[in-house]
Amino acid sequence: MNTQEILDTYQHSIIQIETPLASGSGFYLDKYQLIITNSHVVTGLKKVVISSKDLKRKEATVVYDDPKYDLAFIRTERLELETTLRLSTNRVHDGDKVVAIGHPYGLNYTATEGIVSKAARLQGELEYIQIDAAINPGNSGGPVLNEAGQVIGVNTFIIQNSNNLGFALPFSYVQEALDAFEKLAQDDIIRCLSCLNLVHESDIKDDYCPECGVKIDVAKKRREGYIPVGTIKTLEGILQEMGKDVALARRGQRMWQIDIGTARIEISYYDNGVIVADASLCRLPQENIEELYRFLLEENSKMDYLKFAIDDNSIMLSYIIVDSSLEEKNGAIALGRLFSKADIYDDILIKNYGAIIIKRDD
């Protein structure tokens, strides 16, 4: 298969994975009903958000975390796919053509082709497949496929400032980890970095390995979960009071995204202390723009907290405040108005003024 055929065939098996601390890729193996990714993608957390072409954003549980191999398994319900990925069983050779699939920079489903420049490159104590396909941030955890569409490795890391020099964990390590995990027949398994034993989360006391006594950092992160603090905690508290699912709304630690009707609201907390909540309503029409502008100006004079603005050709309804002024009461009032007004104004602008619905790549 060529690159486009591989992408068309298997893109439904490629999963986007997000935590407040990182984002990356993974791939679904139907045989195990597991999503395979990197340990560093899940950032030690037990709960992550997953999505795909066939899967709406939802929380899922990391059931296996292996810092040694930089592997993690995520449990999900069976995905009904016409064609499913499977691990290769064939030896990889220098010069083999490969395709790396993932979500670079959080974008949807891209594939880059290249070759195996070295089938076994020793890094630390593990052998990796060195490839020259472009691997970008966000590709981590995604599959590297051969020409038959079989998984030969997991995109794991790149060498900074190199010319497309990427490294994939070979399928043999993945298969070894899957076999060991399946043999235990239980979830919530962590590999100790010191003794390399697989231990159950419930057997770990005070975050120390029950086999060798060395502290397991991943155990503490999984137990505590993600804990927002300061202004981020205040913002998320407001959103929760409004009935929003904060875990699904997060886009990193300092940004949240919520869709209300056809409007999309993005809340950003900047390093300078400014909080901006933008509702992207619709696009400017090609006709009757003056009439629309007049309406926006009239509405601006009537509103507290909120203001209309134009960003390129998008009509925005915005709320801006500095963190030192944000309190739960005033924040809840302002964001409540933004959410309700956004749902009303996008309909008015589209129906009465010919504004154009924004097409979104979800």
Please identify what each model-predicted range represents.
Residues 1-25, 47, 179-184:
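N-terminal activation segment of mature serine protease catalytic domains
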Residues 2, 83-127, 136, 156-166, ...:
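Flexible, gly/ser-rich surface segments that form the specificity/activation loops bordering the active-site cleft
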Residues 349-362:
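Short, highly charged C-terminal tails/helix-capping segments
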Residues 12-23, 30-101, 106-109, 125-126:
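Conserved active-site neighborhood of the chymotrypsin/trypsin-like protease fold
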Residues 1-7, 104, 151-219:
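C-terminal cap/linker of serine protease catalytic domains
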Residues 220-288:
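Long, charge-rich boundary regions
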Residues 277-318:
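Short, internal acidic amphipathic alpha-helical interface segments
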Residues 27, 134-155:
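Catalytic nucleophile loop of clan PA
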